[in-house]
């Protein structure tokens, strides 16, 4: 393809819209109990798997932004082990926060991709330690306090991060 021929990197956000639909939180017990529309991990992992097949077929260089699932780390590791020219990052908050923060409809924890499970958090940290994840990003998306006042599912996703990322 064109990108492979000119040596550019394609930056990808991996989320299958048919699976994510109108979801706003990780598919889990808390979201289920609160009745919030969910985004299963499969929305990310299926998108990554599909992109990796295209990357393998075309030879393009690609960067996956904002990983949130432990299973995504495994897919990227397999791709790198196969010699595919892929890199990835994780948002800082995915390394420190989990879906537990949405308990009580805490809209300050409304981010996209959503905060995932404790297990996902640990696998993301492990992927970073092992060099599968190449870098940490801020995903700095501050919003006014009024943007977080509506019912959880109606609030905008976003979190401030730059002020805690830079010393």
Would you name each region that the model predicts?
Residues 10, 149, 159-162:
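Generic intrinsically disordered, low-complexity segments enriched for polar/acidic and small residues
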Residues 44, 154-167:
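Gly/Ser/Thr-rich active-site loops/lids in small-molecule metabolic enzymes
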Residues 138-145, 161-167:
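Active-site anion/phosphate-binding pocket segments in diverse small-molecule metabolic enzymes
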């Amino acid at each position: 393809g064109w990108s492979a021929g000119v040596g550019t990197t394609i930056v990808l956000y991996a989320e299958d819209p048919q699976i994510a639909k109108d979801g706003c939180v990780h598919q889990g017990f808390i979201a289920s109990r609160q009745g919030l529309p969910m985004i299963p991990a499969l929305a990310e992992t299926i998108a990554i798997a599909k992109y990796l097949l295209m990357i393998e077929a075309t030879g393009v260089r690609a960067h996956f932004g904002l990983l949130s699932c432990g299973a995504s780390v495994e897919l990227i590791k397999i791709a790198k082990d196969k010699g595919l020219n892929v890199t990835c990052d994780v948002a800082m908050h995915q390394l420190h926060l989990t879906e537990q923060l949405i308990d009580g409809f805490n809209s300050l924890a409304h981010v996209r991709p959503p905060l995932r499970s404790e297990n996902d958090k640990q696998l993301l940290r492990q992927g970073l330690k092992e060099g599968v994840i190449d870098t940490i990003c801020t995903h700095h998306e501050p919003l006014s306090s009024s943007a977080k006042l509506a019912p959880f599912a109606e609030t905008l996703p976003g979190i401030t991060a730059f002020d805690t990322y830079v010393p």
